[in-house]
Design a protein with these regions (language model features):
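Bacterial N-terminal signal peptides
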Residues: 7-18
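Predominantly the C-terminal beta-signal and adjacent terminal strand-loop region
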Residues: 226, 283, 350-356, 366-396
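Positively charged n-region of N-terminal signal peptides that target proteins for export
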Residues: 1-4
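N-terminal periplasmic/intermembrane-space "pro-region" immediately following the signal or transit peptide
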Residues: 23-73, 77
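Membrane-embedded beta-strand positions of outer-membrane beta-barrel proteins
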Residues: 72-74, 90, 108-112, 137-141, ...
Length: 396
């Protein structure tokens, strides 16, 4: 799994309520608010980890006979959108007997979460690689019932209404290496979703018609995908570049109720600073065409871009964000990070009226020294509020 997930990145775009995550296997999909990264964690800290190491007849572990590794990591957290919540990723990492030395491990994952406001979700993930990592295949199934606040389009007004949204989603992606470090492929998504408002006794956001929020939709998209990856480590890169681009198309000819397009491009850059530091930078832009349902509009607060915003408090057809994060290891286990960024949302390319900013810092504890996977605790201040984050793996 390429930089497996905080499940920014499934960020289940269907469900704006799902907290931030990075891209599961870089499919730009998210399942919940915790990365499903795993490998040789610390038993008793975030759950029990089994390295699947078999012993030889003389009682010594033989690294050549390693068959599988697993992790279970229950993580409590709290955010403005859901209140207290518990996320539990369960991951199994293994190499089939026919896998070659260049093939990454296969990953089977199960993820679930439950929140104080009675939101819940559960998902399955399977990631496979074939032919010396020439082919990468990812599949996911997800079911969720979410309660979250809708602030209208644009954002910053403060008023909101609570929406109930149920969704079932299936996703499959196939990528093929066509040049060194360059992959091309397709991602297909099919989902059913029902959504309706819990109308409060308060003034509604300007221009908001509650009847427009009651929907029962079938969603289906086909998305050409590009990925360019020169990172030296998929879990904690110290150098290299990661570029992702996709163009999702929805048409009735493939079973969708709506016709629209969604475009997204992102670039992460990593630079080693001395022996203990890393400067990570990221730029992302997203665009949605006419006909896109509001819950698929780009928004801050549902991914790793511009931490410090409640989910969906700023959403519109265009989004752009730039951020940098300095990561430092004080010891083999203990580290910290400081980050900041700027961004905005707008109805069109020339409509950038309000600049948004974000700044924060966090603590890191390395759970898996072999692959540099850390427990991440961040506090971020945005334009309007302060938000706390707990997860496994780096934000991007």
């Amino acid at each position: 799994m390429r930089s497996p997930v905080c499940c920014a990145s499934l960020v289940l775009l269907l469900l704006p309520g799902v907290p931030s995550a990075s891209a599961m296997a870089q499919t730009e999909v998210a399942i919940g608010g915790v990365k499903l990264d795993s490998e040789l964690g610390v038993p008793g800290v975030l759950g029990d980890v089994d390295d699947g190491l078999e012993e030889s007849a003389d009682g010594r572990s033989d690294s050549k006979r390693r068959s599988w590794e697993s992790v279970v990591a229950p993580i409590p957290s709290r955010n403005p959108a859901f209140g207290w919540m518990l996320s539990v990723p369960v991951m199994l990492m293994y190499k089939p007997s026919f896998a070659g030395p260049e093939d990454p491990v296969w990953i089977s994952g199960l993820f679930g979460f439950y929140a104080e406001n009675e939101s819940w979700g559960a998902g399955l993930l399977q990631r496979m690689s074939f032919g010396g990592d020439r082919w990468r295949v990812t599949g996911a199934l997800f079911r969720a019932e979410m309660n979250y606040e809708y602030f209208g389009i644009g954002g910053g007004g403060g008023a909101s209404i609570v929406l109930d949204q149920d969704a079932d989603l299936a996703l499959v992606e196939g990528l093929r290496r066509v040049a060194p470090n360059l992959y091309l492929g397709l991602q297909a998504m099919y989902a059913r979703t029902e959504l309706g408002p819990q109308l409060p006794d308060v003034d509604l956001p300007p221009g908001l018609d509650p009847d427009r929020l009651r929907v029962d939709l079938t969603l289906a998209t086909i998305a050409p995908r590009l990925q360019y990856d020169t990172r030296d480590n998929e879990f904690y890169p110290r150098s290299g570049l990661l570029v992702n681009a996709s163009a999702a198309v929805s048409r009735d000819s493939i079973g969708a109720d709506l016709d629209y397009e969604r475009y997204k491009a992102s670039m992460n850059h990593y630079l080693a600073v001395g022996n203990q530091g890393v400067l990570a930078s990221r730029i992302v832009t997203q665009y949605t065409s006419d006909g896109t349902p509001f819950f698929l509009f780009p928004a801050f607060g549902q991914g790793a871009d511009l931490r410090g915003y409640q989910m969906g408090s700023y959403r519109d057809r265009f989004l752009v964000a730039v951020q940098s994060e300095y990561r430092h290891r004080f010891t083999k286990r203990i580290g910290a990070a400081a980050f900041g960024g700027v961004g905005s949302v707008a109805p069109d390319f020339g409509g950038w009226e309000k600049s948004l900013w974000s700044a924060g810092a966090g603590f890191r504890f390395v759970l898996a020294p072999k692959n540099d996977i850390s427990l991440r605790v961040d506090v971020a201040r945005g334009r309007d509020e302060t938000v706390y984050y707990v997860g496994v793996g780096e934000a991007f």
